[in-house]
Amino acid sequence: MNDPWLKSSIMAKRGVAKGEAGRRHELSITAQGDFHYVYGPYAKPVLTINPGDIVVVETEDAFGGVITSEQDSPTAKLQFPFLNPQCGPVAISGVEKGDCLAVQIHAVETRGEQPAGTTCIIPEFGGLVGTASTAMLNPPLPERVRKMHVDKNGVRWSDKIVLPYQPFIGTIGVSPEIEAISSLQPDYHGGNMDLPDVAPGAILYFPVHTKGGLLYVGDCHAAQGDGELSGVAVEQRATVTLQIDVIKNWSFAWPRLETENFLMTIGSARPLEDAARIAYRELVRWMSADYGFDEIDAYMLLSQAGRIRLGNMVDPKYTMGASILKKYLVS
């Protein structure tokens, strides 16, 4: 743990490994073999690790690498539902249902040939068009693909526009107990949350539903606005470095996130306000369970000091993250 604050994180205080790094594992594209398009308990783990171990994962982009040119047709190239390929699952020794998987994101690094970033318009997909879930008579928007040079200096949208390079993990989570949930969908297990806070320096906390936890990861972005409005971020192949620990007997309903300055709870649902309600309800419960607030006081404080972050407004369920600064967590 290089950042000083990590020594005081929940992961360091309560994790089996106490924040100490263990063995380092490499999960290359070759070692991964077949990708997964659902989160579930039925796939054999590609890797089994111990609490505290570090895993370096090579991920494919959300398109499976098939869109290589601005002349490509997404409709012709993409094969639904085989989108958003996931690496894993990674099993963690000693993890049982009712535990928590703590995942610290060390790095998300762009890999592959330039232009490494891809975004596009996919007909009948996005936040301002008719979709299968929101049926409209309007004709689909025309397809369009944009390829971008991506490096630490920025995302070169055009000769005049350079976006900040803010890499993060779009899709990450654990296995449900018996369900198989599409990698395109976010839910209580995590999944396709598209939340820009899931970035280097953050620690995610997932409720475990099955033995081993079974962590999946993929779909990294180089940049994305709140809501991922058109349905597609600046998609990229990436090398992701994760340190994974276990907190025994810490059970809760939805994913949580910790940074140096704030705590966040994540909810996914339709309509959008229900995702916000889930996120805020879970934050009230966390403040009550671990920080000495009664629920009414927490509810009232969040009305003044809470913040809400829109992850996506395009997926089968929408994602919101509710947060509060740590400096206010004194009851």
Predicted regions and their residues:
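Short, structured beta-strand/loop micro-motifs enriched in basic residues and often containing a Trp
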Residues: 30-40, 80-87, 181-189, 283
